[in-house]
Amino acid sequence: MTRVIVTRPLREGQPWLQVLRARGWDAQALPLIELGTAPDQTSLNAAWQALQTPGRTYQALMFVSAAAVDGFWAARPATDSTSRGDGTRSIRCWATGPGTRRALLAVGIAPEQIDAPSTEAGQFDSEALWQVVSTGLRQDARVLIVRGADAMPGSVDALGGSGAGRDWLAQQLRAAQIEVDFVVSYVRALPVLDSAQCALARQAATDGSVWLFSSSQALQNLQRILPGQDWSMARAVASHPRIERAAKSAGFGAVKLARPVLDELMASIESLA
């Protein structure tokens, strides 16, 4: 049985582990990104306050990932925990992909409030999201981009080099005369792997395991954890062209591109198994 290495942060990776195991794969968790609490809670509190202040609120909140949603709602004022008097009832919520959309639904955002690329979109990224939202914006609008921050300088996030996805979207918004604010709702850090996890990673570099990557930073962290490891016999499935390029640059011998939807991931895994 081919082993599949799920590299997503532990909480985000659990659904994939369950599905893969149900389909008969030997799926193993090897989280290559550690998620933590945002260091500046003051900025998060200010963002929530703006949502409750007439004349200061946003037309849309853009979330770069499911972790961004979770971190943002973790800072929600306790007095609004049941009333939805938090200013989000009428604001559009933008998601780049299905995982982020599910996270928004889980915190109580109504499906009709969410803008996201369709499940048939060629990619789930900022460019695809822009095609959905660009025609419905007011020129005097404000958009808040809720993102993560890297604990280590120079890291690459799931949207591309140095936050390329969110920076590209912010440029499009500003060119359309839209005011853009940012707030950090979580941090991404290098995980500390134990000896068994390091042994699993080394073995999976040569034994035919299939690695699943949904973040370029996960690849960077893997290279930091195992410097000098030869990946020429390793096989991987990447969820975005930027991540595909990063895997090839890291030396992975075989890399398949697949959107992060179940049927495509399964087909790519099977083609490498």
Which residues does each predicted region cover?
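Conserved beta-alpha
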Residues: 1-273
